[in-house]
Curated annotation (Swiss-Prot):
Catalytic activity: D-glucose + ATP = D-glucose 6-phosphate + ADP + H(+); a D-hexose + ATP = a D-hexose 6-phosphate + ADP + H(+); D-mannose + ATP = D-mannose 6-phosphate + ADP + H(+)
Family the entry assigns: Belongs to the hexokinase family.
Residue ranges of the region described as Hexokinase large subdomain: 205-466
Start and end residues of each Hexokinase domain: 4-477
Gene Ontology molecular-function annotations: ATP binding; D-glucose binding; fructokinase activity; glucokinase activity; mannokinase activity
Protein name per the record: Glucokinase-1
Keyword Transferase: yes
Function description: Glukokinase specific for aldohexoses. Phosphorylates glucose and mannose, but not fructose.
Region Glucose-binding, residue ranges: 146-172
Top EC class of this enzyme: transferase
InterPro entries: ATPase_NBD, Hexokinase, Hexokinase_BS, Hexokinase_C, Hexokinase_N
Length: 481
């Protein structure tokens, strides 16, 4: 028999994570407003700008899928791994990829002033050299390589091949990188180890790469579905991009905009940096656990507050803080569990096992997952309540994840471009790809959003694999040395 007080407390907490239809509509409307504000000219201090960052990527074309006969490099600095790959475009929506992935050493995430930008980018350059030695030894020095660099952190991008870091996210704490051009930092280290023939010609992020990769792979022969209109990431972090009309990007230098228009360009990919949506907390659903995690356990308090409710890095931490609170109320006993003193120990993999476990199984998968992750023994009654919490956390995340999708579709009028118009959304990231039911919950929220059930039926959420690799290579394709 479960403790009535514990059950009541858990039910009360779950109620705090409910996102209603009216809240989805309110958030969608506000998101559009923040997009429009973000497209206006920037303040001199970029951190003081209102609205979303809405960073121009200087990518003005989407691939057709027929590009072929060239091999390029891509480097991807994510939140967990650094990856180098070579991409050979074969045409007909096909490509060949060679890649190596290495885990980023933990000391780069520690608050250690002795770790510098040079340490990080030298590490990346050495891994690039190892990759070329292994996979392209015969031409390592004889070939002029174009490289696209996927750097999925907020940057002030001023051209296709230059951008200064605004702030770190995802746990990095290397202070001297902020304000520096990350392309120059990487290129310098490549030059210093003898790879001056590798030219970092395009700076992109994982969302732009996801959109471009999905465009290359998309091959709807009947043209019943429009080419992808949004690229999005729901993994360790979250972000999204889309193609905006040049005439609406008022923050672009007027001369640059006119030059692009004179070249026949009509759109530019905008990196929304939607992880920063509503940092002012005007409308975002907020619990005491969200506030505590932001202020006490995150590396960037006050920033990326949308991301801290949606991304995989934080979902398990929300659960951990709820359990700590229940123990503080003397309603739950964490015993000697390592949960007490280890922030971020609960991963989305652990939550995934809990999410889909069944009562018929006595929630044994939940028991095993909590034992493995946190050395926490639980009763069946406790597991029932923990599963209820997990499902409340994930449902809120998925419902919030639908908001920017709906907002962009409305702002761009993407669902009304042609008769019976349907659109693709290219998605990447461990949460959207692997978390049980996440996409289904997103679709439910889209139907509740202002696009309605009719609009939701015309939206296709497609997993776009290798966006940060293939997409970065595609970004580099037409760039100059």
């Amino acid at each position: 028999m479960s403790d009535p007080k514990l059950t009541k407390a858990v039910d009360s907490i779950c109620d705090q994570f409910i996102v209603t239809k009216s809240k989805i509509s309110q958030l969608t409307e506000y998101f559009i407003d923040c997009m429009e504000k973000g497209l206006e000219p920037c303040e001199s201090d970029i951190s003081q700008n209102k609205g979303l960052p809405m960073i121009p990527t200087f990518v003005t074309d989407k691939p057709s899928g027929q590009e072929h006969g060239v091999t390029m490099l891509a480097a991807d600095l994510g939140g967990t791994n650094f990856r180098v790959c070579s991409v050979e475009l074969l045409g007909n929506h096909e490509f060949k990829i060679e890649q190596e992935k290495s885990k980023i050493p933990t000391f780069f995430f520690q608050d250690d002033h002795h770790v510098t930008s040079k340490d990080l980018f030298q590490h990346m350059a050495l891994i690039t050299h190892q990759f070329l030695t292994k996979h392209h030894k015969d031409v390592i020095q004889d070939y002029k390589w174009k490289m696209g660099f996927t750097f999925s952190y907020p940057v002030d991008q001023t051209s296709l091949s230059s951008g200064k870091l605004i702030r770190w996210t995802k746990g990095f704490k290397i202070g001297d990188t902020v304000g520096q051009d990350v392309v120059q930092l990487f290129q310098q280290e490549l030059n210093d180890i003898g790879l001056s023939n590798v030219h970092v010609v395009a700076l992109t992020n994982d969302t732009t790469g996801t959109l471009l990769a999905r465009c290359y792979a998309s091959s709807d022969a009947a043209r019943a579905i429009n080419e992808p209109v949004i690229g999005c990431i729901f993994g360790t972090g979250t972000n999204g991009c889309y193609m905006e009309k040049l005439e609406n990007i008022h923050k672009l230098d007027p001369a640059s905009r006119e030059e692009l228009l004179s070249q026949g360009k009509t759109h530019m990919c905008i990196n929304t940096e939607w992880g920063s949506f509503d940092n002012e907390l005007n409308h975002l659903p907020t619990t005491s656990y969200d506030i505590k995690i932001d202020q006490q356990f995150s590396t960037n308090p006050g920033f990326h507050l949308f991301e801290k409710r949606v991304s995989g890095l934080y979902l398990g931490e929300i659960l951990r803080n709820i359990l700590l609170d229940l123990e503080k109320q003397e309603l739950f006993d964490l015993k000697e569990s390592v949960l007490k003193n280890n922030p971020f120990i609960l991963t989305t993999e652990t939550l995934s096992h809990i999410e889909i476990d069944t009562v018929e199984n006595d929630l044994q998968d939940t028991r095993d997952a909590l034992l493995k992750a946190a050395d926490l023994e639980t009763t069946f009654e406790e597991r029932v309540l923990i599963q209820k919490l997990v499902r409340a956390i994930s449902r809120r995340a998925a419902f919030l994840a639908a908001v920017p999708i709906a907002a962009i579709l409305i702002k761009t009028n993407a669902l009304n471009q042609s008769y019976h118009c349907q659109v693709e959304v290219g998605c990447d990231g461990s949460v959207v790809e692997h978390y049980p039911g996440f996409r289904s919950m997103m679709r439910h929220a889209l139907a509740l959003s202002p696009i309605g059930p009719e609009g939701e039926r015309d939206v296709h959420l497609r997993i776009s694999k290798d966006g940060s690799g293939v997409g970065a290579a595609l970004c580099a394709l037409h760039a100059n040395y």
